[in-house]
Amino acid sequence: MQHHDIPGAAPQPIDKLLAPFRRFFAIEASSGILLMAATVLALVWANSGFSASYHALWSNKVTVGFGDYALSKALILWINDGLMAIFFFVVGLEIKREILAGELASPRQAALPIAAAIGGMLVPAGIYLALNGGTAAASGWGVPMATDIAFALGILSLLGDRVPLSLKVFLTAVAIVDDLGAILVIAFFYTANLSFSFLMLGFAAFAVMLLLNWLGVRRVTPYLLVGLVLWFALLKSGVHATIAGVLGAMAIPARSALAPAVLRGTARQALSVFENALQGDTPVLASQDKSHAIHHVEMLTEKAGTPLQRLEHALHPWVAWFIMPVFALANAGVTVSAEMVSMLFEPLSLGIFFGLLLGKQGGVTLAVWLLVKTGIAKLPKGVGLGMYYGIGWLAGIGFTMAIFIATLAFEDPAHIEAAKMSILCASFVAGFGGYMLMRVLLRGREPEKA
């Protein structure tokens, strides 16, 4: 916690300078706004007189290492294979947290979002295959299965505190299960020819990370170092490197080093020492007792938390406000031409468009309706099926996740460009339509109490 967060702390000049940025990043929809800005910039850049510089930038080779131990890849591949591995690492941390202590911890709680996510994956894939089955484009069935959680939640947050908390939690849980589905699709269906030796190296690295967890190692550095080996091994094995992020997250310790009873007793003792040491006006630097007391509280705070929480808290801002906007900037720059517009009416583009737009809303709503009708799940008080239909619209915002899967699903650059254009069109319609529908459904509703 910085001093600007503490009531009564004297504001510093840097606080006034950074205040506008802090206000922006405190807005729930800020990551979605940045994503949208990056997308618009990419589209304008790719369709301007500087389009050649746009494509040349991402094609530049970047080399990491030295001599025979160097890895050289185009900048866009460092983004898609490297930065996106960090994104999937954070996704993996979220999945693990939700399974252990969140909406997916209880089978009864988890039933509704899991069923909705499965419906929201199967129906879009089915629509796509109905239009493209047996063709060269059939491999793209995984593209309309994806949901962009940042955009979907960002648009939902624009509706303010009239949105029931249960709906926000539901959409988050659906997106997390959806991400898990996307991870499995990437791992099992969009994997190149496998290298057994590198696969074994990756398996060994993952086993070492699990061993570190079992031994009670709570420092992040050992996991980071072994995780880099895991990433490199999977990159060379043929399995997509982003899977290393998910596997690494599964090995991160998720339990506190202190039992609740021990934590309570130690906390009381630490606070007592802290209060006694802080008596008087002696500066901290001049008092060894005060310095020791502060250090003691810091150590207790670190032990009370979990490595999973610390990593998620530290990495989430980087993912939301840097990695995803950079990914959008590098991948959303589709050059619009007459040929590209005509391709929007091809089965590939139509399969993605209708899969995201109709498949998501139909799959999510149908799954919720079936579970409620069969008595397996109940809708929260004051929330009707219509609101879940609105959530189905927002789940059709595939954007970054769908674009990422499209880059893996297709080899033909023309197919990739057509898929990107279709994803952008479907995501825009789903986002705008979902926002307008939810706005109507929430009209006259009392704001949620904090």
Curated annotation (Swiss-Prot):
<feature type="transmembrane region" description="Helical">
    <location>
        <begin position="75"/>
        <end position="95"/>
    </location>
</feature>
<feature type="transmembrane region" description="Helical">
    <location>
        <begin position="140"/>
        <end position="160"/>
    </location>
</feature>
<keyword id="KW-0739">Sodium transport</keyword>
<feature type="transmembrane region" description="Helical">
    <location>
        <begin position="352"/>
        <end position="372"/>
    </location>
</feature>
<keyword id="KW-0050">Antiport</keyword>
<comment type="function">
    <text>Na(+)/H(+) antiporter that extrudes sodium in exchange for external protons.</text>
</comment>
<feature type="transmembrane region" description="Helical">
    <location>
        <begin position="390"/>
        <end position="410"/>
    </location>
</feature>
<keyword id="KW-0472">Membrane</keyword>
<feature type="transmembrane region" description="Helical">
    <location>
        <begin position="422"/>
        <end position="442"/>
    </location>
</feature>
<dbReference type="GO" id="GO:0015385">
    <property type="term" value="F:sodium:proton antiporter activity"/>
</dbReference>
<feature type="transmembrane region" description="Helical">
    <location>
        <begin position="111"/>
        <end position="131"/>
    </location>
</feature>
<keyword id="KW-1003">Cell membrane</keyword>
<dbReference type="InterPro" id="IPR004670">
    <property type="entry name" value="NhaA"/>
</dbReference>
<feature type="transmembrane region" description="Helical">
    <location>
        <begin position="318"/>
        <end position="338"/>
    </location>
</feature>
<keyword id="KW-0915">Sodium</keyword>
<dbReference type="GO" id="GO:0006885">
    <property type="term" value="P:regulation of pH"/>
</dbReference>
<dbReference type="Pfam" id="PF06965">
    <property type="entry name" value="Na_H_antiport_1"/>
</dbReference>
<keyword id="KW-0812">Transmembrane</keyword>
<keyword id="KW-0997">Cell inner membrane</keyword>
<dbReference type="InterPro" id="IPR023171">
    <property type="entry name" value="Na/H_antiporter_dom_sf"/>
</dbReference>
<feature type="transmembrane region" description="Helical">
    <location>
        <begin position="196"/>
        <end position="216"/>
    </location>
</feature>
<protein>
    <recommendedName>
        <fullName>Na(+)/H(+) antiporter NhaA</fullName>
    </recommendedName>
</protein>
<comment type="similarity">
    <text>Belongs to the NhaA Na(+)/H(+) (TC 2.A.33) antiporter family.</text>
</comment>
<keyword id="KW-1133">Transmembrane helix</keyword>
<keyword id="KW-0406">Ion transport</keyword>
<feature type="transmembrane region" description="Helical">
    <location>
        <begin position="24"/>
        <end position="44"/>
    </location>
</feature>
<dbReference type="GO" id="GO:0005886">
    <property type="term" value="C:plasma membrane"/>
</dbReference>
<feature type="transmembrane region" description="Helical">
    <location>
        <begin position="224"/>
        <end position="244"/>
    </location>
</feature>
<feature type="transmembrane region" description="Helical">
    <location>
        <begin position="169"/>
        <end position="189"/>
    </location>
</feature>
<keyword id="KW-0813">Transport</keyword>
